[in-house]
Design a protein with these regions (language model features):
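Active-site-proximal, substrate-binding regions of enzyme catalytic domains
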Residues: 2-109, 113-115, 122-137, 141-145, ...
């Protein structure tokens, strides 16, 4: 997934994985807020994150669920309805490629409201791009933009990645790569 650290659409509909990846690092989440990024979710994602029955909830999962509830009480990550007509409008149902309702509804709702979609699912990101949607973004892209624009410093990189790993998330390598891309982009912009 190619990213440009100099550009990031600040208003995004987040899918389930992105919600967890953003909230996995309090430092990343705080920097995104400071940069005036705004994230919302669809009711499908809300269900997957907080309502869907689970056999058991690991402590790190409970922590992320608690963080999401706290953010929602503060007005962030608000849930919005996405109807079947929204999904049909972009012919997503025919192109599902084993995507879940959370990813599909996030793409459809983002297109409907003409805002960004943030997904860390490669197939969902590709579907959004293939549908001609310019604002398909990822958590590593957000991270690289925050580094590039100076909202996160070089010293924050290890903190964000460590917090991410401690929360049981799995994109540490992508975050490291995004960090390196942001440094290269910053170097190129001053040359």
């Amino acid at each position: 997934m190619a990213i440009d650290p100099s550009k990031f659409h600040p208003v995004n509909v987040a899918d389930t994985c992105s919600v967890w990846n953003i909230l996995s690092s309090p430092r990343l989440s705080a920097a995104a807020k400071e940069a005036r990024c705004d994230f919302c979710v669809t009711s499908f994602v809300q269900y997957e994150c907080l309502i869907k029955p689970r056999k058991s909830i690991l402590p790190n999962e409970q922590t992320l669920m608690d963080r999401l509830r706290a953010e929602q009480r503060r007005g962030a990550f608000q849930a919005h309805s996405c109807g079947i007509e929204d999904l049909q409008a972009i012919e997503v149902l025919e192109k599902r490629k084993k995507l879940g309702k959370g990813e599909l509804s996030s793409i459809a709702f983002a297109m409907k409201i003409r805002q960004g979609v943030i997904t860390d699912d490669r197939k969902a990101w590709q579907l959004a791009k293939d549908s001609g949607y310019a604002y398909a973004q990822t958590t590593p892209h957000l991270f690289s933009w925050l580094i590039f624009t100076g909202r996160l410093g070089d010293g924050d990189k290890d903190t964000v990645i460590t917090q991410h790993i401690d929360a049981g998330r799995h994109i540490a390598q992508q975050l490291q790569t995004a960090y390196e891309i942001s440094l290269q982009c910053r170097l190129n912009s001053t040359a």
